[in-house]
Amino acid sequence: MNKKILSILLSCVLLLALAACGGNNSGSASTGDSQTSGGMSSDSGSSGGNKNITLVLSQRDEWLSTLVDAAEAAAKEKGYNMNTVDCLSDVSKAIQFVESARNAGEEVVIVNLVDPSQAGEIIEAAGSMKVVFVNRLPGDMGLLNENAVYVGSNEREAGIYQAKALAEYFKAQGKTEIKYILLNGILGQASTINRTEGVLSTLAEEGINATEASAPLACDYDRANAMDQISPLLTSGTQFDCIISNNDAMALGAVEAMKGANMDPSALPIVGVDCTADGAAAVASGDMYMTVFQNAVGQGSGAMQAAINLLNGDPIDTNTGLSVDGENPHIVWVPFEPVTADNVANYQ
């Protein structure tokens, strides 16, 4: 009887041991498959270090959403988890999100600035974290260093492409004196300032004397805003030869306003920037004369790769297919590309 009891006890011990082993194996699998808010395996990719990277977005729009998707795809490919947070154009939220990433133990953060003058505060909030600014260049480029870099496009270049297209258009008509309506983005923002300066200075260099048909319209990069603001000019009889817009959305607002006023938008050149899907369609149809492709995918994937390069101690342009600035090694440029009726099919 004692032997039977002993045998039963030994069997129970053995079963408990086997159950414990099975429980440990199950727990390891669960840990390996755990998901972050980015929806990717936290253990994928190379080992060591915090595998989470936060992208702090100034706001959501069509173009920036494409940038986010490209950054997330690049993160996933390299075995990192990306979490995107939207500041809703609130400077204070940007600081809070950066601090949260730092407190979570993240080692690098990607920031699309709400305000270019905010860069110093972002770097301070990041503490020991490395920072990649994307798309919006800090107002003070002297803040950039081996731990704080920029990936984006040279905004002045977009204006240069607009001006060259307009100069060619008007010279073909034998015209060197023109009046323009200017649709500005967010006032004070680097993209607004540099795109505007680029187009106006290059028109002068090209021998085109361009004067304002009205005061610039500050439309905040918004289609509906542009439509509302330009409509009174169209119905008041204001004379103009072209519409220069800091982005496609505002240019498309002007197109809609002209159609609403029974005017043909293809009768004069309307130029934009970004080459959004709608912008490309407008160029193809003739409603817009041209746009300038701003590579959202290149900026998003380039920023993520630069962030990973900083973590690994590699040059920031490694594996990006891009080049650093000739004078500032902490800037990686993503080139703009002019888009006209001749090549728009390549962008659709």
Model-identified regions with their sequence ranges:
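Hydrophobic alpha-helical segments within soluble ligand-binding/sensing domains
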Residues: G49, A94, Y150-I178, A226-M227, ...
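Bacterial lipoprotein signal-peptidase II cleavage site
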Residues: A19-S46
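Sec-dependent N-terminal signal peptides of Gram-positive bacterial secreted proteins and lipoproteins
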Residues: N2-N24
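Flexible loop/hinge segments that line or gate small-molecule binding clefts
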Residues: E121-E157, T276-A284, M288-Y289
